[in-house]
Amino acid sequence: MANQLRERHQGLKKKYRELIDGDPSLPPEKRNQVNLAQLLRDSREHNKQLSEELKELKQRLAEVHGDNKLLRMTIAKQRLGDEEVGTRHFPAHEREDLVQQLERAREQTEALEQSLKAATDELQDVRAERNVYQEKAHRLNLEINHILGSHENRILDIDALCMENRYLHERLMQLQEEVSLLKSNVMKYKSALESKKNCKVYGKSNSSALTGVLSAKQVQELLLSEENGCSLPVTSQSISDLKSLATALLETIHEKNMVIRHQRQTNKILGNRVAELERKLKTLEVSGLWSLPGITYNVSLGLGRRKAVIVLSDSQHVQSTTEQSVHLTPEAMVADEEIVTGEEVTEDTGLSADFSQDECQAGAVELNQNSDYFTHTYSVSATPQVSTPAENIQPVESMQSKTLALCDSERSACTAERSEQHDEDLQSGGHQSMSTEASLKALEEQAVENDNFSGDCESQGALEDSQPVTSETSGSFDCISGSESCTAEQQTERSIEEETEHASLNTSPPEQTSPHQECPSS
């Protein structure tokens, strides 16, 4: 090996000298060109040899790595005696990395466990605080209900009270602004009246008749005189008249703008009120709480220009007449507006009641039962009924023993009752909860007298079936009667008679009669 290397070294040294010195037989120029070409060719061959050697060395290195790995696996198998140890064997540095990763994961797990414990403790605190607030709200509801003297089973809604309080506060602020505006107008009129009186006292009768306050007639006369050719003379009096006219018109425009602004504010308040009520109704509809105590539905009845209102209380007790499921109130006799809460009902929506003769005769309700609620639903027909004063109420379920109180009383008693209840409605303004105890006492006193009228009710029940009766708002039942087979002419005649009776009742003083007469079922 050493001899071969020595011979190779001698040969390479000889070639190197020949390349440097060149062939002595050639001229110097040719000698340099031959040397450069030979050097380039030799360098290329040398590069090829080196690249081949590099590939061979890389292949041998890969083979050596494979042999080392196989040898390590064989040694590990011999030590542990496990055939599957090859998949679990790691070098020392890889084991260190795995241990470090495991420690970091353990630290993260401990941190997450601590945060979970903290979140659990916070959740328990929040739940305890929520329970405390719920109990506090329940106690406040009970206390407020006890203070207001309401029914024990009808807990008041604090949110509803707050909403009503906000609405009343806004209306109060608006009314105060309107009062201030009216006061300013009154002061203006007073100043104009005083100036006119002073002119009369000091003898200034020739002064202008125009003041800061002008009526529409004065403005019209002044403008018509200008149009007819009677122009005002250019004097100080005419100039003052025109100035006062312009001032009065400007003040009138300002007042109109104030009125429009107040009207817009009123519309905004009413819109917010309607939106709050719609949100509350939507919440009740989603949660399925339509049958809670205290929920009422005011449904209008088409009575021509007059609109009566039926209040359907879904879940009130039967024991008191102020908490019955049907109330007919002529609230729209005072104004053409109607309040509709609960389900949406239009102005022309008709509410109709088709009762059979057996149901009309056996329609008395036992008022001494304390445990049952009205659970019947009523389908409201959307057909507008203008000439018919009272339409059909169709119960969806079959009416059992606890149904609506239908009383066929005498015509004179019902007329006096309607007059009395109409006057009470105008005075009370729809506050039927304040007169509950009085109506209950009156019912207890009237229960003894009703026994004497039971025979008359049976005999006159057929004659009074087709007569619609408008009932009270102060918490008592009225006589609801309807005929199953009625022609259009009879309904028209009844509506005309009803309007005349209402007109006579508005002028006649109310009689001192009982607000309710109950007729037992035949």
Curated annotation (Swiss-Prot):
Residues 1-196, 260-287 form a coiled coil. The keyword Coiled coil applies. InterPro entries: Coiled-coil_dom-contain_pr_149. Residues 429-438, 467-490, 503-522 have a biased composition (Polar residues). Pfam families: CC149 (PF09789). The keyword Coiled coil applies. Residues 413-522 are annotated as: Disordered. Keywords: Coiled coil. PANTHER family: COILED-COIL DOMAIN-CONTAINING PROTEIN 149 (PTHR21682:SF2). Belongs to the CCDC149 family. This is Coiled-coil domain-containing protein 149-B. The lineage of its organism: Eukaryota, Metazoa, Chordata, Craniata, Vertebrata.
